[in-house]
């Protein structure tokens, strides 16, 4: 250990060792002390610690690294960190922490800082008094050479103090840290820091290097803090100057020591690098401080350079550069050293090859050279050569990727010397040296270590910096290649290519120089151009093409430069004399061809190019027979297609003639390559005139108008239009067919949505641009679009929304147009609607459009048009309406368009009410969508109109006040039509429209009776002479739910008219229509009429209906009366009289007339059913009604059921009214007596099941069929139980069998198209549901008979195949059926066809396994696909088997309580659901017979096992026969477990009763449950008939099985 001063360690702390660590008396006696990092220290006092902690601390003092690591790990994982808050522990840590923080082993260093993090978290502020003892090693740990240790040290310190508080820490403890690290750096060595008895010398050297490096980096860090702390706001008590003074004092001590400066050339790389960092930082912030020590540094520079290593070279060279930059006068100290000249030092440094990849060594070396200066660095030619030779030698020895850096440094070094040196001899020598390199490079004698492309990049880089070098390169190059003895073809092509590229690159550098005269430019640039032009005519095509491509680059370089006359003349001469022949020789794919355009572009602003260009063109057209000429001519348009030369060169007649002929020859075949045509269009007024482009456009248009175009036509069309853009309106007027182009591109549907659509968009944008400039042109284009689109809409050949969208696009794009420009004119609507109204007048349902009932009171208008024509007109109305609606939704509309739409809406709604495609055979799509969309649109318009208005104002403005606006105008127009004196069909339709729209308004309003009377009074409704107008207004206001005084007055007047003498049906109908309109739809307790007038009214009107209405088939007044009665019932329910009988007669009459397919009849039926339903609910309140209900119950149910079964035959079955009737029928038939159901035959039910698409009707039909089947099965069961001597012969009804046999088709196809085939699949599965219903609550023999029939007809196989497809059982992943019930189903719970079919399928599969288990199991066993059977078993075991097992066990438990088991007291049956086992015990005296039935988990796909447990009183043969008989019922007879138990019980009981068993099967009871009844006449043994039959069949004889005699029946 080195001797050191003691003044640094004077302070003592009670209970603590000194910060210097002067612990032992021995050390004091020797006048030596140890720092707290030394290996020599006094062990800390541990007496106050617990035993476990003492062990840990002592382990930390041991030499063994593993023991230290374990001790530190124990501290890190200490359970109670509060024990660290102990003075003796913290004292001990102050002793151990510095030594552990610099330990040789990195794991120890890492763990000590991890522990410091734990300690910081545990103690926080409590650690503050001890921080001055820990801070130095802690901060030194920041700069540990191991990154993980460094990060751990910083993280642990962050745990104690956040980073924003660190500056205050350095300020407070900086004066403590600096002396210690300085002292450690100067006085510690490997002997003091490492115990060499336990560590190697290398480990000790590494440790001391790491520690000293950390010391220097810590000082660097602290020095940087002095600059950062200048702006730090601190407590006044803390003196910044103290910290700074202490730091400078210790730095001075450090810098004064020779040991510090000796490290400049030290082999300790880490310390040297840290030293350079320290010096650089001090130099940056405080240059004067370094100034006083500069001599110490500079006198060691030569030694430093000679001792640089791979790690130290870059930082030390950077340091030297900075020092020279700051102290330039000091260079002479080492530059003039005769023993160590700089050139020698640096050449040795270069040849040492100490550079690392990407280290920046050569960059730093060049920077150092520039700092030193050329005159100091290379004072003589010899020194230049010495350094150049060193670079070349190193480049040849370096690796390839490093040699590029060496070459680059060499070239930049020469450039630096050439530029910086003032000695002309040295400059000339540099040029000579470079000329030698270039010449050898051209000759291929200069062997490169790196790739040639990398070397070329080096050359380009230095040429960019030094244009003299670029000139030198060209001088050498031209001299080399102009040597007549040199054959260029002998030079490697790659080398030639690179050299020419560098030559052209030098042109760019020459361009950037400011030359004074043209001669000076030509003297430099002329040889280069002449050389390249000469090479471009070389006989070798590769060389010629290479030269041409380089000339192209030259053209690009000078494209933005003003050329001098000699250069222009040189290019023009080359253009005319040499280039055409080169192009013809090399072809249009060569660079020479592109060079033609580039030279023309270069010269276009300097001279008239017409004559030179014509000269060139004539050389190309001199012979059309030569293939080379044709290829060049065909490629010329693509060269000039960019149009840059338009107006710069003139048309050449020979070229125009050629291209006219060529273009139209190509267009004759659409399959040709049309790129040349497109290029010709682009070269307009360069190669071809505008007239040629027009002819191309007109020819292409013909293909478009005939829809016979291909992509080539579109591309050419688009290009032509854009080329002729300036005169487009004039050209369109010249050829009117062009106006048809816009609709074609608007409405075409390109398959290629990208390519073709882009061209369409381009054409549209062009036309739009020109239309905005010319209003006349715009109007003509829009007129064409309007005519085209409206015609296509009417024909149904285009989607209405698409047409509307395109017209809206044109409307918004092509300037100002009237809003109705693209709508159908009023004349169209008048003609179409007028032709359809008479037809629809006979097709309406008055329950849907009540006001249209007035049409019956108007003289019938003859229908003089053909039905097909009516259909066509209606289709036109529909298409026009849908288009108009889409159009006005976007653009808005006026009152006329809305008026026309409303009439169309009425007609289309009637069409829908009749059912889609039930009126006209012409198909109409999206009618429902139109109705919904129009209602939504109309409601939206009403809401807009009503905004910020009260209800009274809204109705006044719509119906009374004369104001503008499309909604008021619309309502006034309908009001005027409906109140006109001359009543026509049109006015009645208008009245219905008024009603519909008033309903929309009324639903959005709230008004009281007073305000309603105000509106009705202003309308003069009570005195109006128009019943249509009165009815339409009152019907429209019904949603307001008010019964005002005026409404009551109108109602009473109508009743008065109907109470007197009634004459014509028309008058009665008018009064009834008004009465209905004046009757509120809400059924309230408030009487509609005074009770005194009700009876007279009912008697009078029912008498008229009975005597005149029904007999004369005047159904309208009867309908109106039944409609009124529905709302009148609460008022008259308590009245009695004969009129109730009449009303029930009308209802029955309506049911009887229901077979007539007429809209008025369907409305009559609906009103009758609705009234009957209301009467049926509360008939107990009125004895007359009750009597009518009871008396007519059976007949009424019969009529209702008959009407129900007729539904599928009605042509109006899809109408809204018919569907409403069906809903009432379903409700009224819920309690239909079984007697009525059984009175109908099966053939009357099944058509309804098969032809109905209504799920509710289908469900009711199934209910009736089950009712009928149940009754018949019960009768059959009773009959065969009485006639027990005969085996039952039961078969399914023929209609059911026919449907089961007539399978609808391929299951795979049907399931894949579920929506299409849903009905067929559903009917088929429902038929099977009915078949399985035969097995419910009947005898086993009857079941067996039906099963045999199914087997005989092979009906089960197609069913199972269908179920496999529906449930996806043939695939690895069957469908998930968890959401579907299995035991029962309700198809109305599901909205999708797929869900309905799957729900029904899983139920049928459940029924199959329940009733036909043996048959299903047999079918699956035939399938040899193991994967399939595994899927089926898995699916069944998860979804069906648990239900079947539970149901079977339930059946057994119920059977135990039945008479069959209770009658035998010795039988005991036990059920164990957990194990799925059934125990059968038969007690015989004190003994018992026991059998067990075990149900598998995949029941019934796996057989139930019947096992004999215990037997007594029977031999083995009989015992096995009973087991086999029970097993047979389960495995092959489709029997249930209950069936097997019953057979087993009877066999045993009859055996012990002495009944003789069959001599073949040894059982008393056969599987058919019959006794042995066939006795042999010889041996007298009895046999079962079935057993005997099987014996005869198998033995092919009729002999007795026992005695072998001929069998004679006894």
Curated annotation (Swiss-Prot):
Pathway(s) it belongs to: Protein modification; protein ubiquitination
Keywords, comma-separated and alphabetical: Cytoplasm, Metal-binding, Nucleus, Repeat, Transferase, Ubl conjugation pathway, Zinc, Zinc-finger
HEAT repeat positions: 110-148, 314-351, 372-408, 409-443, 590-626, 627-664, 736-773, 965-1003, 1119-1156, 1322-1354, 1355-1393, 1435-1473
Classification via SUPFAM superfamilies: ARM repeat, RING/U-box
Major site of localization recorded for this protein: nucleus
ZnF (RING-type) intervals: 1558-1604
Gene Ontology cellular-component terms listed: cytosol; nucleus; RQC complex
GO molecular function, a single term: ubiquitin protein ligase activity
Presence of the UniProt keyword Nucleus in the record: yes
Top-level taxon in the UniProt lineage: Eukaryota
Catalytic activity: S-ubiquitinyl-[E2 ubiquitin-conjugating enzyme]-L-cysteine + [acceptor protein]-L-lysine = [E2 ubiquitin-conjugating enzyme]-L-cysteine + N(6)-ubiquitinyl-[acceptor protein]-L-lysine
GO biological process terms held by the UniProt record: protein ubiquitination; rescue of stalled ribosome; ribosome-associated ubiquitin-dependent protein catabolic process
Compositionally biased tracts (Basic and acidic residues): 1-10
PROSITE patterns: ZF_RING_2
EC numbers, comma separated: 2.3.2.27
Subcellular location: Nucleus; Cytoplasm, Cytosol
UniProt-annotated stretches for the region Disordered: 1-20
Function (record text): E3 ubiquitin-protein ligase component of the ribosome quality control complex (RQC), a ribosome-associated complex that mediates ubiquitination and extraction of incompletely synthesized nascent chains for proteasomal degradation. Mediates ubiquitination of proteins derived from mRNAs lacking stop codons (non-stop proteins) and other translation arrest products induced by poly-lysine sequences and tandem rare codons. Ubiquitination leads to cdc48 recruitment for extraction and degradation of the incomplete translation product. May indirectly play a role in chromatin function and transcription.
Family: Belongs to the LTN1 family.
Assembly description: Component of the ribosome quality control complex (RQC), composed of the E3 ubiquitin ligase rkr1/ltn1, rqc1 and mtr1/rqc2, as well as cdc48 and its ubiquitin-binding cofactors. RQC forms a stable complex with 60S ribosomal subunits.
The protein, known as: E3 ubiquitin-protein ligase listerin
Species assigned in the record: Schizosaccharomyces pombe (strain 972 / ATCC 24843) (Fission yeast)
